[in-house]
From Swiss-Prot:
GO terms for molecular function: dolichyl pyrophosphate Glc2Man9GlcNAc2 alpha-1,2-glucosyltransferase activity. This is Dol-P-Glc:Glc(2)Man(9)GlcNAc(2)-PP-Dol alpha-1,2-glucosyltransferase. The gene is ALG10. Coiled coil: none annotated. It comes from the Eukaryota. Pathway: Protein modification; protein glycosylation. One of its GO terms (cellular component) is endoplasmic reticulum membrane.
Length: 522
C-alpha cells in the first residue's frame, strides 16, 4: 500500500469538517429545491408535526410506528423560529422541519462524537469524529425529516455521559435521562440503553480502583462481582438505568407490544439472516478502517489451522446457507417499493443466492442462457455470499477482540493501547472490555433478529458502536490512524455523492402515477 507522509493526511483531515458541513448544506438546499414536498416516510412525520404546531396534541396517525420524539423536537424548533418573525406555517413547513436534522448532523452529532472519541481515542478524536459524522446512513438523512438522526444522536449523548471520568452521580443521571429520551425516537433503543449501562458500570468499576484483569472470564466475573456490591457508585448506576427499563416495561404493558401503530405490518419474526446482512454492511462500509494486507493475511493463514480446516468449511458450506434458506424473510414492504436500494439487492443478489434459484427470475433470460450455466451461477452466488458472510463475522469479531487492551486502565494510569506509554488522568481512555463487547453483541442480535424487514437504517447503531470501539491494528501492533481516517472520510463521501446524485438527479416515474417523480434512496 502506498505510504503517505504523516503530515499530509493530518492537513487534509483538518479540512474535512468544513468540507463535510459545506456538502451537507449544498445537499440540503438542493433537496428542498428539487423535492420540496414530503417524501416517503416524511408524508407521515411532517403532517404529524404540523398537527402539534397547530396545538392538536390528541391527533395521531395510526400508521406511525414510533413514539413522538421527532415531532416534539420539530414543534420546539418551530416555536423558536416564530420568535424570529416567521409565521407559524413557515416555521412548521417542510423546509423548516428538515432543518432539524441538518442541525443535528452539522452541530450536535459531531460535538457528541468528539466527546466520545476523546474518551476512547484520545488526541485523534476530532479527526475520528468528523470522519464518522459523514457516515452515509447519518449524512444522507441530514436533508430529510426522518427519526433516525435524532434517535442516533440521543443514544450517542447517553454514551458520552456514561464515559465521563469517574462517572459522577449527575453524569449517570444525565446518561439515563438521554437513554429515556432516545426511546421517544425508536423503541429498540432500550437495548442500546442496556449497553450504555454496562459501559457506565465498567467505567465506574475500573476508575474507582479495581485491579486490572486480563482475559474474558476474569473481566466478566470481576464486573459481576462489582455489580453486586452494595456501594453508592454502583447503586446509583443500577437505579438510574433500571428506572429507564421499568418505564419502558410500563409502555410495553400499556401499548400491548413494541410497535406503536400499524402493528399488522410490524410483527416480530425470527430473522437470523438480518444479522448476516448487518455484518456485510459493517464490513463493506468500514473497510478503510479495518483493511490491511496483514489483516487479510491473518484470515488466510487461519484457514490452515485446525479450526480453519474444520469449522470454517462447516459454516460456509452448511450452517450459513441453511440458516439463510430456513430463516430469510421476504417482507411485503421489501417487494412493494422499488425506490430503495435494498429492493434491487434482494431481487438480484440475495434471493437468487439464498434460495439457489436460477437468476433468470431476475434477468428474464431463460432462453438465452443454458440451464446448467444458470445452476452454476446460482450455486456460485450461494457460496460466495456464504463466504462473504463468514469473513464479515470473523472480521467484526477479530477487530473488536483485538481492540481489548492487555490490561484495563486503573485510576487514569496504565497501558496506552495506542502507543504503549503511560496515561495521565487528564486523558484516561475508556477502552473496550469483554463485558462491553458481549453487551454490544446481545443488543445487535436482539434488535435485528426480530425485525422482518431488511432495512439498512437498523444497522446504524451496531455500526457506530463497532466503529467507536474498534482499534485498527497491523500484525498485532497499534497503528497511526490519520491515513485511515482520511481514507474513511473519502470513502464515505464518495458513497454520499453517489446516493445524493441518484436521489436528486435520477428521478423516475411509476406508470400508475404519471407526473409524480420518485427518487432512489437507502
Amino acid at each position: 500500500m502506498l505510504t503517505v507522509p504523516p503530515l499530509i493526511p493530518r492537513l487534509l483531515l483538518a479540512l474535512t469538517p468544513l468540507a463535510t458541513i459545506a456538502a451537507a448544506f449544498f445537499y440540503f438546499s438542493q433537496t428542498n429545491v428539487l423535492q420540496p414536498t414530503p417524501y416517503i416516510d416524511e408524508i407521515f412525520h411532517i403532517p404529524q408535526t404540523q398537527q402539534y404546531c397547530k396545538g392538536h396534541w390528541n391527533a395521531w396517525d395510526s400508521k406511525i410506528t414510533t413514539p413522538p420524539g421527532l415531532y416534539i423536537i420539530g414543534y420546539a424548533w418551530a416555536r423558536m423560529l416564530t420568535l424570529t418573525g416567521l409565521s407559524e406555517s413557515e416555521a412548521c413547513s417542510t423546509l423548516s422541519l428538515r432543518a432539524v436534522n441538518l442541525m443535528a448532523v452539522v452541530i450536535y452529532i459531531p460535538a457528541t462524537l468528539y466527546i466520545i472519541q476523546r474518551r476512547v481515542w484520545g488526541s485523534q478524536a476530532h479527526f475520528s469524529a468528523f470522519s464518522l459524522v459523514s457516515f452515509p446512513l447519518i449524512w444522507f438523512y441530514a436533508a430529510l425529516y426522518y427519526t433516525d438522526v435524532w434517535s442516533t444522536a440521543t443514544v450517542l449523548m447517553a454514551l458520552a455521559f456514561a464515559l465521563s471520568p469517574r462517572v459522577p452521580f449527575y453524569m449517570v443521571q444525565l446518561s439515563a435521562l438521554m437513554c429515556a429520551v432516545s426511546l421517544f425516537f425508536r423503541q429498540t433503543n432500550i437495548l442500546w440503553a442496556a449497553v450504555v449501562a454496562v459501559i457506565a458500570i465498567e467505567n465506574s468499576h475500573y476508575s474507582n480502583g479495581a485491579p486490572p484483569k486480563n482475559g474474558a472470564l476474569a473481566q466478566i466475573f470481576s464486573t459481576i462481582s462489582y455489580t453486586f456490591q452494595i456501594e453508592l457508585p454502583i447503586f446509583n448506576i443500577l437505579i438510574s438505568y433500571a428506572s429507564v427499563a421499568v418505564g419502558f416495561s410500563f409502555f410495553l404493558y400499556i401499548n400491548g407490544g413494541i410497535a406503536l401503530g400499524d402493528k399488522d405490518n410490524h410483527v416480530a419474526g425470527n430473522h437470523i439472516p438480518q444479522v448476516f446482512y448487518c455484518a456485510l454492511f459493517i464490513t463493506t462500509l468500514g473497510f478503510p478502517v479495518w483493511f490491511t494486507w496483514a489483516h487479510l493475511k491473518a484470515y488466510i493463514s487461519s484457514s490452515f489451522s485446525v479450526l480453519g480446516l474444520t469449522v470454517r468449511p462447516l459454516f460456509i458450506f452448511v450452517l450459513i446457507p441453511r440458516l439463510l434458506k430456513s430463516y430469510a424473510i421476504e417482507h411485503p414492504f421489501l417487494l412493494a417499493d422499488n425506490r430503495h436500494y435494498v429492493f434491487y439487492l434482494w431481487r438480484r443478489l440475495l434471493k437468487p443466492a439464498i434460495y439457489s434459484i436460477s437468476v433468470e427470475d431476475v434477468m428474464q433470460s431463460q432462453d438465452a442462457i443454458d440451464p446448467k450455466t444458470l445452476d452454476v451461477i446460482s450455486i456460485g452466488l450461494k457460496y460466495a455470499l456464504s463466504a462473504a458472510i463468514y469473513f464479515s463475522l470473523w472480521n467484526i469479531w477479530t477487530t473488536l477482540t483485538n481492540s481489548i487492551p492487555a490490561a484495563i486502565l486503573v485510576r487514569g494510569r496504565g497501558f496506552n493501547r495506542r502507543n504503549g506509554k503511560s496515561i495521565s488522568p487528564a486523558i484516561d481512555l475508556q477502552c473496550l472490555t469483554w463485558p462491553i463487547l458481549l453487551a454490544m453483541v446481545f443488543a445487535t442480535l436482539a434488535s435485528l433478529i426480530p425485525s422482518p424487514l431488511i432495512e439498512p437504517r437498523y444497522y446504524i447503531l451496531p455500526y457506530l458502536f463497532w466503529r467507536i470501539y474498534m482499534t485498527p491494528t497491523t500484525a498485532g501492533k497499534r497503528v497511526n490512524t490519520d491515513a485511515r481516517f482520511l481514507r474513511e472520510w473519502i470513502w464515505y463521501m464518495l458513497i454520499n455523492a453517489a446516493t445524493v446524485y441518484m436521489f436528486l438527479y435520477k428521478p423516475f416515474e411509476w406508470a400508475h402515477e404519471p407526473g409524480v417523480l420518485q427518487r432512489f434512496m437507502w
